[in-house]
Amino acid sequence: MKVQETRSHVHALGEEEKVMTRKQKAESKAHEVEHSPKKAKVEKEDGHINGKSETGVAEEYDEFCKATTEHLPLEQMRDILEANGLDSSGSDLEITRRCQDLLFYGALDKCSVCNGSLEFDGRRYVCRGFYSEWASCTFSTRNPPRKQEPIKLPDSVQNSLASDLLKKYQDPSHRPHRDLGLAEKPFTGMMISLMGRLTRTHHYWKTTIEKHGGKVANSIIGSTCLVASPAERERGGTSKLAEAMERSIPVVREAWLIDSIEKQEPQPLEAYDLVSDLSVDGKGIPWDKQDPGEEAIESLSAELKLYGKRGVYKDTKLQEQGGKIFERDGILYNCAFSVCDQGRGLNDYCVMQLIVVPENRLHLYFKKGRVGDDPNAEERLEEWDNVDGALKEFVRLFEEITGNEFEPWEREKKFQKKPLKFYPIDMDDGIEVRHGALGLRQLGIAATHCKLEPLVANFMKVLCSQEIYKYALMEMGYDCPDLPIGMVTNLHLKKCEDVLLEFIDKVKSLKETGPKAEAVWTDFSQRWFTLMHSTRPFNFRDYQEIADHAAAALEGVRDITQASHLIGDMTGSTIDDPLSETYKKLGCSISALDKSSDDYEMIVKYLEKTYEPVKVGDIEYGVSVENIFAVQTGGCPSYEDIIKLPNKVLLWCGSRSSNLLRHLQKGFLPAICSLPIPGYMFGKAIVCSDAAAEAARYGFTAVDRPEGFLVLAIASLGNEITELKTPPEDASSLEEKKVGVKGPGKKKTDESEHFVWKDDIKVPCGKLVASDHQDSPLEYNEYAVYDKKRARISYLVGVKYEEKEEKGAVIDTAE
């Protein structure tokens, strides 16, 4: 076996221990805390605790720590912890801190949320337990519950030099009370060095840092970080900057100080890094710690490294030698994994492959790390002479990182998630669209060689370009270049859907409040971002976030996966006309409308009447029509069938360009879930609007991508329409009855201007006016159809968003 490349993974624990050592020292010297109302039972009016001042207690604890460190060996500390039913594992620092806290202040009671163990982390008491196999508990407190019972001292300690000191605190009534209060300061225990011309003077920052618990150091040695101005970087820096880089001391922007003070928590230093790309190796900043704007730039320029189940990971460079994924007995030895547990600071991916190159040379590739942080990833590429040995090592690694057996997963998809272990991303056998679709250089050539009508060829060029899918995944935060999120199996998508629906049902009937309710949301968040690996994970807090970042995102990923299968691999020659090939796979007919036709003029009028400018910041965007395409798709009922149905209305539907290939092949799919939020409040329905403004708000993505498409559909609302003025508590009855539903918005189209188009199709074309429903959660009227056979995509309106000079009514939207 030859090892070609190795990198050691730099664990966060080491850094945490350094920080906590400083924090513990600071905490031991003095507890600079405010008096808390919670201390009323043990504090006297003069601020004394059990007859001692806070400073006195802190000094006593400091002396106690010195004595126990000197006279109590680590093994005896472990014995004490075990005798009292506490965890005796961990680093020397953790064991010492845990034992000293127990002996001086008394045994900690269990976490009130998950019944796990509480532990002091240098700033507060945090829980080390788990809500579930997916999520660690994030409960924390500054005033932990203590057991009012004597400490158990094992025989090995009874006759030790420290026994008299320890027995002094055995009786609960003699113990000092430790309450960290609410006045913990963000820079407690930190030494901060300043350099260069900052926006405020060094004197100002020295005073401010000291006010918030820190100290300012003139020397870089021993500093937590160096705060410098960007100008220092541009000038190449000084000896102080060079020394900080040599000593691997973080160099951060001034914004780190500002944000840490504002949030009253020290912010992650790597997110404010100023110089990592100047160092020889490059430290690498994980994407989830970067500014979203900087992360977006990296994402859009990044190449997808793993495109699917047969994809050889790009960094191995073995695909250039003709490398292919090793296959035996129907199993492809290529696995990708994800784990997200924000309570433990985890948001990692893992890739594991067996790759065979010509002449039957076999390689095992393994990589584990964080997106964007390659220098700190654990990575190795090994050549194996023995196939069975390589297979055994692959299986061993799978079991090590997941806690599950390999074959039951690959053959039957049997898998049980284990705490802090990885979960497989079930890749499909295909080529993800960020790899297989047309790159910028190929777009023009592909359209030139296309046999389709020029306007249709240009339309297909847009839908077959990498760009729209890269942007869509970047905007959703599912743009990890190391995992093919746009090429996962239907089984994986179904697992995501099941987890989402189960959570929504749970939260709708939730009776818990406070930390226990937060735990339900936190648990779902970790499940979700493990299954759907994100470069920007967070804890969901409300229904709107669920709608935007889970439901809509899952629908988007589902549609991008379908686009990946349709587009396949266009990376080769474009002379073979890949655009026409994809067009054939759609099984639909697309034709550009003549701009002088009645249909074209009617649609432009309908758009102009029911549109309101999209607002981004202080800028408003109008819209102009570029082209209109008539569509006949096999995924929808035919025109002949739809016109036989009652109460037909021409309505607008919002869509992103990245959703369109799936729409054109499969037709509309209903919303994935029911939420009391616009777009999802009608349950699993196809939702349309009589206002182009609503569709435009959904279709607008960003000012640097002004082109988009609005969908016009014919929907049969049926003879009976149910009007809902508030979100229904349960939409399942509506789904079962399959009746048409209308949700009145704050604005409606002027009914006096409505007209009937051909074949008795109503067109609610009228200027937008205020309705009688100003308390509605909807801005515009929305209509819901529950039967796919009652909605037909008829037109795609290609639009361009343009900055407006004059002010008008606006739609608030996020860029």
Swiss-Prot record:
Q: What keywords were assigned to this record?
A: ADP-ribosylation, DNA-binding, Glycosyltransferase, Metal-binding, NAD, Nucleotidyltransferase, Nucleus, Transferase, Zinc, Zinc-finger
Q: What class of enzyme is it?
A: transferase
Q: Which residues form the PADR1 zinc-binding domain?
A: 39-179
The entry's Zn(2+)-binding residues are C111, C114, C127, C137
Enumerate the subcellular locations listed in this protein's record, separating them with semicolons. Nucleus
PARP catalytic domain: from which residue to which, for each copy?
Answer: 577-808
Q: Which reaction does it catalyse?
A: L-aspartyl-[protein] + NAD(+) = 4-O-(ADP-D-ribosyl)-L-aspartyl-[protein] + nicotinamide; L-glutamyl-[protein] + NAD(+) = 5-O-(ADP-D-ribosyl)-L-glutamyl-[protein] + nicotinamide
| One example of a Gene Ontology biological process annotation | double-strand break repair
User: What segment(s) does the record annotate as region Zinc ribbon?
Assistant: 106-150
Bias (Basic and acidic residues): 1-51, 726-739
**Region annotation (Disordered) ranges:** 1-52, 726-749
Which positions fall inside the PARP alpha-helical domain? Answer: 449-568
Which EC number(s) does UniProt give? 2.4.2.-
Q: Which domain of life is it from?
A: Eukaryota
Residue ranges of every copy of the SAP domain listed in the record: 69-103
GO (cellular component) term, any one:
nucleolus
Q: Does the keyword Manganese apply?
A: no
Record flagged with keyword Nucleus: yes
What family does the entry list?
A: Belongs to the ARTD/PARP family.
Q: What does this protein do?
A: Involved in the base excision repair (BER) pathway, by catalyzing the poly(ADP-ribosyl)ation of a limited number of acceptor proteins involved in chromatin architecture and in DNA metabolism. This modification follows DNA damages and appears as an obligatory step in a detection/signaling pathway leading to the reparation of DNA strand breaks.
Q: What is this protein called?
A: Protein ADP-ribosyltransferase PARP3
Q: What is the lineage of its organism?
A: Eukaryota, Viridiplantae, Streptophyta, Embryophyta, Tracheophyta
What is the primary gene name for this protein?
Answer: PARP3
